[in-house]
């Protein structure tokens, strides 16, 4: 005998919900149409859902994650990169007489020769070391913190706090393998990260769902399917709304 597989019907939104979704999408669409002056004026930028591998003039490598922006300034005395937005992984060529600096928000990283990741978004900066040593200066300490293999530092401008942790190699810049590793993160925070990889908009309509916690490895090459798989056990659903719009809500 054939087995019938039930599939949940798409959720029907009320007229009020549709009005809210439409207004939010329209506002976001207007914002998206505005010129991205930060990206236009920067030395390097990467488009949505693409990485960009850059060989710098000293032979060092900078890999930009999706929707990331960076400025580069080298002179005879020092090498300096400013990560304005997003995430980057650096493989730095050692030059003992010319230090390599990465600026991200209020954090400054000093390097001689090493491999490490930096991210900056909404006032939060994270630094993770895959090999070698870096010195990280934050506003919370008079002296730089020395980070070695596996060390992870995060600084939040919101509460002016610096936190240290140990990370395994697979947790350092997993976006290089098109993975997002979420460990006890809120649905809202995961959606914020997925927006970097999803063309268009992701709208969260349920505040309670946004506060639920996720631990999962998500495939960044298919953000919609990855998000659906992650929130389905929590009673969430992802639906197509207006063109280039995903609507995240509690399941019917």
Q: Which residues make up each language-model segment?
A:
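A residue-level detector for the "anchor" residue at the start of short, highly conserved motifs
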Residues: 4-23, 29-252
């Amino acid at each position: 005998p054939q087995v019938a597989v039930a599939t949940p019907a798409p959720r029907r939104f009320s007229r009020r919900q549709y009005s809210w979704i439409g207004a939010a999408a329209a506002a976001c669409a207007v914002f998206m149409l505005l010129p991205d002056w930060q990206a236009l004026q920067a030395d390097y930028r990467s488009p949505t859902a693409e990485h960009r591998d850059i060989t710098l003039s000293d032979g060092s490598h900078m890999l930009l994650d999706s929707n990331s922006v960076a400025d580069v300034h080298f002179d005879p005395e020092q090498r300096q990169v400013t990560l304005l937005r997003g995430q980057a992984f650096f493989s730095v060529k050692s030059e003992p007489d010319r230090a390599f600096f990465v600026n991200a928000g209020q954090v400054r990283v000093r390097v001689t020769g090493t491999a490490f990741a930096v991210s900056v978004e909404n006032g939060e900066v994270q630094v993770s070391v895959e090999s070698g040593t870096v010195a990280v200066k934050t506003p919370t300490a008079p002296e730089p913190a020395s980070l070695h293999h596996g060390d992870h530092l995060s600084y939040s401008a919101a509460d002016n706090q610096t936190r240290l942790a140990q990370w395994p190699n697979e947790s350092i810049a997993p976006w290089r393998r098109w993975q997002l590793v979420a460990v006890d993160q809120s649905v809202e925070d995961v959606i914020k990260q997925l927006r970097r990889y999803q063309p268009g908009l992701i709208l969260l309509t349920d505040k309670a769902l946004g506060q639920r916690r996720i631990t999962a490895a998500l495939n960044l090459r298919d953000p919609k399917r990855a998000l659906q798989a992650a929130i389905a056990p929590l009673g969430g659903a992802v639906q197509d709304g207006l063109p280039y719009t995903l609507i995240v809500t509690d399941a019917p």
